[in-house]
Amino acid sequence: SPERINPGDKKNNLNQINKILAYEGESQKVKTLLKNVYKKICKKLIFSKNIKEAETAKGIENIQRDLNIALFNEILIICNRLNLDFNEVIRLASTKWNFINFSPGLVGGHCLPVDPYYLTYIAKKKGYKSKVTLSGRYVNNYMKKYVIDFANFYLRKSQIKKNKIKICIVGLTYKYGVSDITNSQKIEIFKHFKKKFKQTKCYDPFLKSADNLKFNELKKYNFFIFLSKGKKFSNIANLVDKKKII
């Protein structure tokens, strides 16, 4: 039974999603047993007689999302190089009826940074080397370096002395709304700036950390690097000078 719930998503919870249940062979008894257990917690059950096919389906669900995010990450990079407004480009593209909009970002968590490698590894053993799937992984893994380089360029441009720079990293968990830091590239970004600038702290109400600031302490900081987007972070933009936001 591949896991399908989306942490932090209150709408698509275990009760609401289509639940895939896989079993081998023709045993009606096994199917009935699975049905009797899962119907108590899931509204819709989808059955498969092949466990490998069910697990592959789970893999491509994550690969598809990983690739979509990678595409928008790459578009963001290109727009920045061409001095174009990424948000305006996407707004215009979104007026086409079949355009699918995604947000660029730092991919983390238990699934997206990991699952693509399971399928590409097996495919390689069978004689096929993945091109598209691994390209998406390359782009999404690169985003950590891209964010660090972009922020460092901005900080150098400010011409503020190193010992006067006080950085607040906004959002450290792998996605907004969860307390999980599994495979979070944001942690690595935070470590980079913490090592380089001693006066570096974070603000993430979903995370318990000694470096976590309280909301009323934010005014003391002169640079803010936003790594997550969400309701609890939107007030910061109103609190501080927009020139301080990276």
Model-assigned labels for residue ranges:
Residues 1-246:
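Structural/interface elements that position substrates and couple domains in central-metabolism enzymes
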